[in-house]
Amino acid sequence: DGPERLVAAALDHGASRIGLFKPDAGGGVRELTEGDSLDSYPAWKPGERRVFVYQTCGIARHHRTNEWQGLGPASIQKVDMETGEMEAVAEDASFDFLCPSFAPDGTLYYLKRPYEPFHRPSVWRFLLDIVLFPFRLLRALLAFLNVFSMMFSGKPLQTAGTPPRRDGPDPKAVFLHGRWISMEKQMRDAAVDEMTDLVPKNWELVARQRDGTTTVIANNVMSYTIGRDGTIYYSNGKGVFAQSSAAAKPERVSARKLVMCIAEVG
């Protein structure tokens, strides 16, 4: 019947679906998943006919406006297209399981991190905002005057505690796997030639064997990929590392910072 490709397709109302794409059959996409959720990162399972895994998380919406309120915990599900059966591979209300990918030998890799519930306004936070409002207003005024001074004199009003100038990207935050990661403090505290970890230690790269046993490959992982020969490549924000196997020692292959996506080409 020709080659089959798995795709993740976005919908108008903010959800996304896993679809089946056949290039030799007209190019249409047949949706394989449903529900008010974000479905992404589909991957065929090696050695099994028409079986794939994917990442999914439910969408919480406002009961009147239908606007997004947040996302539920991300899990990894397995689908057998021959039988129509679905099975949870990695699912826990306290964790996100992200970016599933298979090695050639059938080992499943994914990222695991603690789940952070979406924001719900609290009375205590509202009262705290009222108390801190004068201080925040003063800080905003000082920041405005500092920018004004830089524009006309080239010199800041504040010099104490100014971070050293560094080359390369210097964002305040990055949006990574559905969550904003603030890097202002890490950048400020880091020395000129080094950078603190950009993601928490509990962001783990996990390997799951066919028998269900799991092994933590690395911590502080923000992105990864598995090569055709089974080599593991991952980034922790300070560089890109390679491991020939789960038990091997990682080797730094690039000093590029803030690598948010890795892919093997060719």
Where in this protein do the model-derived segments appear?
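A short loop-to-beta-strand structural motif that recurs across blades of beta-propeller domains
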Residues: R17-G19, S75-Q77, V199, E204-V206, ...
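Beta-strand-rich domains and repeat architectures in extracellular enzymes and scaffolds
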Residues: D1, I181-K201, I217-I226, M260
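Repeat-solenoid scaffold signature
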Residues: M86-F102, G106-P121
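Short, conserved, GDST-rich strand-edge loop motifs in beta-rich repeat architectures
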Residues: Y54-L71, R113-P200
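Residue-level detector of Asp-centered blade-edge/turn motifs that repeat once per structural unit
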Residues: G2, P46-E48, A103-D105, G227-R228, ...
